[in-house]
């Protein structure tokens, strides 16, 4: 049952073709380990693809990697970003905002937030460069972004309209400390600041909507990834356990 739940994380969070008949409750139960299992797995695939692309396209490899990143995620989180953008643009009561959040049509708010995401993501991927640290930048960013999405679900009560939010909140509400502990090897002082500021912004958004949801978590994962990646690139993971290990590896060999 445990292996079934872990494998189901791949089919739920990614487009990797792993068959699973696990229920949503089983997936939610093991979702607290997905930042490590899914985050690192995605980063390794992205790194391998990027290395191959860089040999052909050099700096432009980052642009192509943008498509790879979203393909690996099956565009699931991107849908949440579009829905949240529409909800944020609605003026008025909570009911109207929730209606926009659940609406399948894409409005100007969704397109606007998508453009914000793409702008940051393109800058981050173009700045990725090619060095020994590249893979660690991607690992850290994937782990951090997945963690913040799940941390939101674990610490903020779900909106009544979100069945997925309720299930994940019930399974994760006792795992918030575990989620933070998973970050220790991958987070730097600068990314702690980004994490806290991003969480506070999303907490305020959740309050205006009446709680968290799967869409909000997905939007958080999507939008925070390029922010963490850009921070990693600028600071080179300074003062993180991962950067210390990288430094020791490079200078001892």
Swiss-Prot record:
Cofactor(s) the record lists: Mg(2+)
Membrane topology: Multi-pass membrane protein
Compartments reported by the entry: Cell membrane
Enzyme Commission number: 2.7.8.26
Keyword terms: Cell membrane, Cobalamin biosynthesis, Magnesium, Membrane, Transferase, Transmembrane, Transmembrane helix
Pathway linked to the protein: Cofactor biosynthesis; adenosylcobalamin biosynthesis; adenosylcobalamin from cob(II)yrinate a,c-diamide: step 7/7
Catalytic activities: alpha-ribazole + adenosylcob(III)inamide-GDP = adenosylcob(III)alamin + GMP + H(+); alpha-ribazole 5'-phosphate + adenosylcob(III)inamide-GDP = adenosylcob(III)alamin 5'-phosphate + GMP + H(+)
GO cellular component, one term: plasma membrane
Location (main, coarse): membrane
GO BP field: cobalamin biosynthetic process
Uppermost EC category: transferase
Residue intervals passing through the bilayer: 33-53, 106-126, 132-152, 178-198
NCBIfam families: cobS
Function recorded in the entry: Joins adenosylcobinamide-GDP and alpha-ribazole to generate adenosylcobalamin (Ado-cobalamin). Also synthesizes adenosylcobalamin 5'-phosphate from adenosylcobinamide-GDP and alpha-ribazole 5'-phosphate.
Family statement: Belongs to the CobS family.
Protein name according to UniProt: Adenosylcobinamide-GDP ribazoletransferase
Organism (species): Saccharolobus islandicus (strain L.S.2.15 / Lassen #1)
């Amino acid at each position: 049952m445990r292996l079934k739940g872990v494998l189901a994380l791949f089919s739920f969070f990614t487009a990797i073709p792993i068959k699973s008949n696990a229920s949503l409750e089983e997936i939610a139960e093991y979702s607290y380990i997905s930042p490590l299992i899914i985050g690192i797995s995605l980063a390794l695939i992205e790194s391998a693809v990027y290395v191959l692309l860089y040999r052909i396209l050099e700096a432009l490899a980052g642009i192509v990697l943008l498509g790879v990143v979203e393909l690996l995620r099956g565009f699931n989180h991107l849908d949440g970003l579009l829905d949240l953008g529409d909800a944020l643009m609605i003026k008025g009561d909570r009911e109207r905002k929730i209606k926009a959040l659940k609406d399948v049509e894409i409005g100007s708010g969704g397109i606007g937030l998508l453009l914000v995401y793409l702008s940051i993501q393109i800058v981050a991927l173009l700045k990725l460069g090619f060095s020994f640290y590249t893979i660690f930048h991607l690992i850290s960013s994937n782990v951090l972004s997945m963690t913040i999405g799940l941390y939101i679900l674990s610490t903020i009560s779900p909106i009544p309209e979100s069945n997925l939010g309720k299930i994940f909140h019930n399974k994760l509400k006792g795992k918030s400390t575990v989620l933070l502990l998973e970050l220790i090897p991958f987070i730097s002082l600068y990314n702690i600041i980004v994490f806290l500021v991003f969480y506070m912004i999303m907490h305020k958004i959740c309050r205006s909507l009446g709680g968290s949801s799967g869409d909000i978590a997905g939007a958080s994962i999507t939008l925070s990834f390029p922010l963490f990646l850009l921070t990693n690139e600028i600071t080179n993971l300074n003062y993180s356990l991962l950067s210390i290990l990288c430094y020791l590896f490079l200078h001892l060999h």
